Every structure is written in C-alpha cells, then in structure tokens.
C-alpha cells in the first residue's frame, strides 16, 4: 500500500470531487470517494489512545522507519511499525504518541531493545519526550537529539551507551529532565549542559565521565536534582553554590576523585534535602553554618579527609534522618546536641580520631559499628568503658586536706549507699524466691504455696500461685521458664508503642525472649483478656511471630512473651544498616512473599484483621524470614486504644485513606499497609519521610507517571545483577494496585500472594549466589 500523507489525502478528495461534478463520473470514482472518507473519518483508533484524525507527516514517518532500522528488537515490540504509517498516530504503533500528525512521544522502556539510536531521530522536530530506559542500547547519543526545539524529557538510563554527552543537549531550552545514568559514557560534561532555564533534573551517575564539574551546574536557577556520583570526576567541588541555585534539593557527588576543601557555599542551599560527597578526597573542616540547611534529611561525607570538630550546630537540623561522617579525620568529642535529633535513624562516625565519651542516648540508639575505629572514644559498648577519675598522686596525698564535706556531698553519698544496699537486698530476695520455688518443685506435687502446673482450658500449661502470686500460661508444651525466672530476668528496653513497652529478657540459662508489657489502662478485663489471648496463643504460621506465653500479675500487670528475633525489625534492617550491607532482589522478594503469606493466613484461617501493619511490626529471624508481629493485639485492648493505634499508623504513612472516616480496619486496609511496605522495599525509602510534601504511594505514582523510574527504585536494585527488570516492574505495579485510593479495587491478600507467585515462581525464590554482605545482628523492635 502506498504511503499516504495528510496533504495527499486532501488532494485525492479534491480530485475525486471534481470527477463527481462531471456528468459522466464513473462508478469506480464514487466507490473510491466513499472508501477514503470511511478510512479517514469513520475507522476507530486501534488502541485507547485518542486520535485527532490527522495522518503522520512524511518526515516523521521516515524518521521512525530510520530509528526502527537501527534497533534490534528480539521480542518483536516494533512489529507494529510497518506499512504506510497510516495508523502510527492512531495508537497502532507501539510506544508512539502524536499531535497534529507529528510524533511527540517515543516511550519504549523495558523492551530489551538493542542496536543504537539513529541520528535521523532529529527529523522528529515535534518530539517532546524520549523514553528508552532499561534496554540494551549501545553506540553514542545522537547529536541531532539536542537540536529538537521542543524536547522536554530524555530518559536513556540503564543502557550501554558510549561516547560523550552531546553538547547540543545544552541548546534544548525547554529541556526539563535528562537522565543518562548507568551507561558507559565518558569524556567531560559539556559546560553548557545546564543552560536550559527549565532544567529540573540531571542524572549522569554511574558512568565514566571525567574532568571537572562545570560551573554552570552550580549556577542553574531551576535545577532541583543533580546526581553525578560514581564517575571519574576530579578537581575541587565548586564553591559557587547558592548564588543562583537556590532550588537545589538533591546533590549527589559521591564515589569520584573530587578534592579540595569542603564547600562553605553549600550552606546557602536552604532547600537542600540530601547531599552526599562520600568516597572522594575532600579535606578541610565542616562549617557551623550547616545548621542553615533546615530541610536537610541526609548528609553523607564518609570516606574523605575532613578534619576538625563535628559542629555542635548539627544538632539544630531537626529534619536530619541520615548522618554519615565515618572514615575521615575528625577530632574532639561527639556533640551531645546530636542526641536531640529525634528523627535520626542512621548515624556513623566510625574510623575517625574522635575522643571522649559517646553521648548516652546515641550509644543506646546505635550499635558499636557506628563508633568503632576511634581509639580514644569510649562508652559505646561493654568492651569500651570510659575510664574512672585517676587517683591522686602520692605528692598530693601527702598534703592534708582541710575541706569539709558540704551538705550536698553528704546527701549524695548517703543516697548512693542506700541505693547499693537496696540493690543487694533485691538480689538476695530473688535468690531466696528461686531457691524456695525449686525446693517446692522437688517435693513432687505436695500441697503448699509453691508453683503448681495445670492445663488451661485452651490447652496451654499454666503456672499458678508461686512466690510471685501471679499466673504464667505457656502455649507450647513443657514450661521453659517459671514466672520467677521471667520476672528476675535481665531486661533491656527495645521500644515503646501504643500497646506498651517491649523488652529483651535474658533468662538465667542465657536464652532470650521478647516481652511486651501491656499498658494496664488500655487492656480489657481479665476474663475477656484471657479468652482472646488463648485464641491468639494457638496461631502458628512460619510468617507470623508466635505468642509463647503470657503472665497476669497480682496487681493487674499483663505481660505477653514472644520469640526473640535477633535480626530486628524490617524497618531497622532496611533503613539503619551500614553502607556495606546490601539487600539483593531475591531477598527483598522473599520478604514480600513472606508478608503476603502471613497476612493471607491471618485473614483466611485466623479471621484476624491486623489493623497496624508497618515495617516496624515485621520482624526477621536468623534466616531473614519475615514474621508479622502485633497481630490480634487490638483484641486485647479497649475500643479507644484501637482508635489510637490507627491514628499512629496514619502518622507513619501506612494508614489507608478511608480509615480517617471508618475508624475500623478491614482486609482492604491491611492490604493497603502491605502495599506501602512493598513500596518501601522497592524504593528503599521510609513512609515516615515526607517526600516533597506527599506520602510514599503518591510520590511513587507521580514518579511512574512522569517516567522517573530510575528515581523510584532503590539504587541497589538497579545495580544488582540478580535484579530482573520485569519482576521489579511488575511488583511495583502490584504494590500500586494495593495502595489504590479506592478500597474496592485493591486485591485481597490471597490475590496478592498469587500474583507474586506468577511474578517470581517459587523455584527461583531461594537465596542466590550473591548473599547479603556483613549483615549485623540488630536489636529486635516491635515499636508498633
């Protein structure tokens, strides 16, 4: 069929009309007239894309054919690019969108396309967006691409493009997004690349670019996101930030060969939220003016030669979540003001020259790996106690002291002595109680006030009476510990929540359990409590944290006992790990599947709605198996306490939008929370962080719509050889389905489980040959 352009079609109509006006018009001419009219006006589009009724121009048709000719299409996505091009603008050609007969969008990501991008793409003069990311494209970027006048977005990341970045791209005055990350590009960054006054996002990370950072990048008035990390850039970091670049929010320059002093002008970027200079050769000191960055969430300068003291003013940046100052030459003490940063969930000052005691709150919140490598630093672990005050020298001892003790000194000494005496009495009392309990057990069932084991109505084993006067009920066979053992165990606070306080209890034999002490004023009456908890105690599933026992004290106290999970919570595992700990895709998918299986069991077999599913309530065992915790605890609480839990979940970003009106959780609200956790695993971002004022699901949905896929996924996933593009993309689609604003359109947990099995069949979910690297043991946390 011969190619038909818009003008040719109109000319044909005019000629046929002339023929019809003649008295002897042939039947064939009339037939052709009706046929062309039907083709042009009455044939519906081939897809859901709206068609404006205009046929593609000849220049654009030829340009697309040239582009197709130089591409390798192993999966046949471009088979539709054939024939006359008549259907190119009506939705018949894959990945093509038009306006008035001209191509405005080419969108073909994740299609396994190879070959190269043709220089004739420059014929598409109306092109606004080119999205060919996550393919296998090689060759150089066409220079003609930068000469397209209305070009607004170029996404070519995750390919094999080589050569230099065309300087012509700096001529595109309407260019808003340029993402060429994760390719094989080399040579220098064109000095004029940021000349566009519309440029918002520039990502050139993970290439082999060399030379210095162009000054124009630090003076762009529109730029909000700049990523140049993982290249071979050298020279100093520019100290010209802030004169015009006041809108910059993200600045990533890590893993280069940049040198020179720390740029003080960085403090002028008052909108900055995230900056990373790690693994360069930066020296000098940190300015106290960093406190002007009031919106800063992440600061990473690890692996440099920065010296001097840590500024006390860093403690004024209340938004700070991630602070990494490790592997530098910092001296002095850690400012106590940093302890005031309530949002801080990652802190690392290891391998510096710091000295003095670690602030108590920091040593309790972060493990020893955050402080090691500082020989003069103390107080961050049992093995690094701070030295006591030195005893006076012999010369001073010979001098008589005539100083009288003040009243304050006498009170302090007396209080200390009294405290020591009380501690000794408590220890003696515990030993006596334990000894008496053991003697009672040795009598083999004699009547008396000792502990007596009895089967409960629900099949658990109860220890009633005893020296504690309380009641301990075990759900799994013989009692592993007595009430006295539990109450005398060494306890370490792990977290607090609406339900109560969680402790890690170390028993006398060295075994560990997690104990949650429920708040007394929010629990149901004892009879209702026992009825509900005896049901929960029978629930067993590989992906649910088992309730092992509970204790009812003589004064109304209620303790519930669970298995202790040494890996901690998923939230800690994902957001508070060290820089050398990587979580590969098979591990993340295994966690997602485990959560889905656990939630399915709760909904279908146990008939329980969780109501407060968060990554803090998903715990990990030694094998990094996901175990959902805190399920069913709402049944033990009053209605008012349940509402409080829902409100807390909403503040953390896991609450389904309809709960603001319903006030009662259901299976669809649980699936929404599961979807948020899946997004958390895919993006590496915490839902508790506000992302430009929107929650995590909204941010992801917007990014996907704008084709910013490279910014959605955790960078570790994009660089992981185990990652399958189709798998993470389909998992992202499923997660967005789970967090749909309309509850009726969300899947049930069973459907989620089924779809995950289709995305990654079970036989491929085992841990791959690339294991987790140096994953440290974390304290278990069930903060929610």
Curated annotation (Swiss-Prot):
**Residue spans, topological domain Extracellular:** 49-409
Q: Which residues lie on this side of the membrane: Cytoplasmic?
A: 431-784
Entry comment on modification after translation = Autophosphorylated.
Reactions that this protein is recorded to catalyse: L-seryl-[protein] + ATP = O-phospho-L-seryl-[protein] + ADP + H(+); L-threonyl-[protein] + ATP = O-phospho-L-threonyl-[protein] + ADP + H(+)
Tell me which Gene3D superfamilies the record gives. Phosphorylase Kinase, domain 1, Ribonuclease Inhibitor, Transferase(Phosphotransferase) domain 1
What Gene Ontology cellular-component terms does the record carry? plasma membrane
* Tissue specificity: Expressed in meristems, including roots, vegetative, inflorescence and floral meristems, and in embryos.
Q: Which Pfam families match?
A: LRR_1, LRR_8, LRRNT_2, PK_Tyr_Ser-Thr
Q: Which UniProt keywords apply?
A: ATP-binding, Cell membrane, Glycoprotein, Kinase, Leucine-rich repeat, Membrane, Nucleotide-binding, Phosphoprotein, Receptor, Repeat, Serine/threonine-protein kinase, Signal, Transferase, Transmembrane, Transmembrane helix
Which residue windows are transmembrane per the record?
A: 410-430
Q: Which InterPro entries match?
A: Kinase-like_dom_sf (IPR011009), Leu-rich_rpt (IPR001611), LRR_dom_sf (IPR032675), LRR_N_plant-typ (IPR013210), Prot_kinase_dom (IPR000719), Ser-Thr/Tyr_kinase_cat_dom (IPR001245), Ser/Thr_kinase-like (IPR052451)
Question: Which residues are sugar-modified?
Answer: 82, 203, 232, 268, 316, 348, 353, 367, 404
Q: Topology in the membrane?
A: Single-pass type I membrane protein
**EC annotation?**
2.7.11.1
Region forming the signal peptide: 1-48
The cysteines covalently paired via disulfide bonds are none
One example of the protein's molecular function in GO is:
protein serine/threonine kinase activity
The yes or no answer to whether the keyword Kinase is present is yes
- Family affiliation: Belongs to the protein kinase superfamily. Ser/Thr protein kinase family.
Describe its function: Can phosphorylate AGL24.
UniProt note: domains: The protein kinase domain is predicted to be catalytically inactive. Lacks the conserved Asp active site at position 612, which is replaced by an Asn residue. However, according to Ref.9, the kinase activity is conserved.
Subunit info here reads: Interacts with AGL24.
This chain belongs to the protein called: Probable leucine-rich repeat receptor-like protein kinase IMK3
* Organism encoding this protein: Arabidopsis thaliana (Mouse-ear cress)
Q: Give the gene name.
A: IMK3
